[in-house]
Amino acid sequence: FYRCSTDVLAAGLLHQEYDIVFTWDSTNLRTQEGVAFRTVEKARLVVALYAGHPLAQRRSLTRQELRGENILYMSPDAAPDSYGDAFFMQRYAEAGYKPNILFRSADTESILMMVAAEEGISLLPDYCTDRLYNADNLVFVPLVGEGEEEEIIAAWQTGNPNPALKRFIAELSETTPPY
C-alpha cells in the first residue's frame, strides 16, 4: 500500500504502476477511457474548529455559515487547479461566496495542527477525524447539506490482465458499500 496524493495515485494507475487505487476522484479518473471504478465509501464532511471558536458548540453547520472564515484548505492532490479543487470551489460558489483560503495542503496533520493553533478552520472528510478522541483544542462539527460528502472509489484499468486483480474486483463487487 502507498499513501500518495490523488494525482500521484491516478498517474500511477494510468501508467500501470498500480493495479488498483482507492481514492477520492479529484482527477476525474472515472472519465478516463479504459478505467473502471466502483464506489466503496461515501464519507461525510466535518468542519474542524479550535475549541474556542464561536461555532465550536454547534451540532451541525452549513457551508453558508462558514462565510468570512479563514480556511485551511485540505486539497486532495498536489496540483493547485485539480478537478477536485474545482469541485469544491464550485460548492463555495453555490454557497454564495469565494473562500478566504489562508493555507493549502494535502497533509491532514499539518491542517489539524494549524486549526489547533487557531489559525483558521478546515473542512475534512470524517475518516480523517473520527478516531481523534480528546484531541487538544480541536472540535469536529458535521457539515450538513446536499452533496457535503466525499466519494471514495476503487479504480482500475479494464485491460489489466492480473488474475489477482480480477478476483479482487469480483470480491469487491459482491460487497455492499457501507453507506
Regions found by a protein language model. Give the residues of each.
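Flexible hinge/capping segments at coil-to-helix
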Residues: 34-45, 49-71, 163-166
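Beta-alpha-beta core module
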Residues: 30-39, 43-44, 109-158
